[in-house]
C-alpha cells in the first residue's frame, strides 16, 4: 500500500500474465471511505492492511462504480470485518448487490448528486458501464479535487504508486469516454467530465495523474 497523496492510500493487485494493475483506495477521513474492494483475492490481501491503517476505526462507506469483480467482488469479505459499512452506488448496481444477496445496506445515488460526510464531499457522474450500458457512477471528491476514474483513463502494466502529469483536457480526450458503444453516451460523459476541475486522478487501472496547466 502507498499513501499516493495526502489522506489517500492505494492498494494494488497485478493480474498475471497480462500485467494489469487493479487499484483500490482508502480515503482516510474521520468517516473512512473505501473506493472499490477489488476481487476476492485482492480483498483477502487488502483487509489486513486496512486494519493496520484504521486501528479501531471502521470503514463507513464503500463506493462502487459498477458491478464487476475488480470493483466489488470482495465486498462480502470486507463487510464481514466492517458490517456497518454502507455501499454507495447507482440504482442498477444496487439491484445487483441485493439480487445476488451480497448486501441490502446501500445508499443509491443518481448522477450529479452530492454525497457528503465528515471531511469529504463527493459529486457523482453518470457512467454508462453496467450491463446493457445501464448507469453506473464515477466519483469526484470535491474538497481534495480527486477524481476516481474507474475504467476510464485505462492503462496496462505494473504501476502501483506511480504518478504522471497531464492537463485535464488531455486526460479527458484520452480517457476512452468517446469509445463507448453508444456514441451519444460517450459524448455526454466527455462533456460531464469537462465540467469538473480535478487536481488528481486516482486511476482504477494504470498511472495516477497529477493535473497540471
Question: PLM features: what roles do these ranges have?
Answer:
Residues 16-18, 40-42, 68-70, 128-132:
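Short beta->alpha connector loops
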Residues 2-51, 137-150:
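Conserved beta-strand hairpin/beta-sheet module of binuclear metal-dependent hydrolase folds
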Residues 35-37, 59-67, 87-91, 147-151, ...:
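Active-site neighborhood of phospho(di)ester-bond hydrolases with catalytic His/Asp-centered motifs
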Residues 42-88:
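Active-site metal-binding motif and surrounding structural segment of the metallo-beta-lactamase
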Residues 60-62, 119-122, 170-177:
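Short, basic, glycine/proline-bearing loop/turn elements
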Residues 88-212:
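Metallo-beta-lactamase
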Residues 39-40, 69, 154, 208:
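Short, glycine/acidic-enriched loop or turn micro-motifs at the edges of active sites
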Amino acid at each position: 500500500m502507498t499513501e499516493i497523496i495526502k489522506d489517500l492510500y492505494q492498494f494494488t493487485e497485478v493480474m498475471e500474465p497480462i500485467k494489469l494493475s487493479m487499484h483500490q483506495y482508502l480515503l482516510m477521513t474521520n468517516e473512512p471511505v473505501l473506493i472499490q474492494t477489488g476481487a476476492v483475492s485482492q480483498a483477502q490481501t487488502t483487509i489486513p492492511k486496512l486494519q493496520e491503517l484504521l486501528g479501531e476505526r471502521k470503514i463507513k462507506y464503500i463506493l462502487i462504480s459498477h458491478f464487476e469483480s475488480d470493483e466489488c467482488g470482495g465486498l462480502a469479505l470486507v463487510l464481514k470485518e466492517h458490517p456497518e459499512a454502507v455501499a454507495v452506488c447507482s440504482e442498477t448496481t444496487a439491484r445487483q448487490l441485493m439480487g445476488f444477496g451480497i448486501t441490502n445496506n446501500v445508499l443509491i445515488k443518481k448522477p450529479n448528486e452530492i454525497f457528503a460526510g465528515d471531511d469529504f464531499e463527493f459529486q457523482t457522474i453518470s457512467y454508462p458501464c453496467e450491463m446493457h450500458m445501464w448507469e453506473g457512477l464515477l466519483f469526484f471528491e470535491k474538497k481534495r479535487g480527486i477524481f476516481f476514474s474507474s475504467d476510464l483513463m485505462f492503462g496496462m502494466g505494473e504501476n502501483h504508486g506511480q504518478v504522471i502529469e497531464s492537463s485535464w483536457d488531455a486526460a479527458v480526450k484520452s480517457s476512452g469516454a468517446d469509445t463507448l458503444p453508444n456514441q451519444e453516451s460517450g459524448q455526454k460523459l466527455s462533456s460531464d467530465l469537462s465540467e469538473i476541475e480535478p487536481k488528481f486522478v486516482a486511476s482504477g487501472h494504470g498511472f495516477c495523474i497529477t493535473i497540471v496547466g
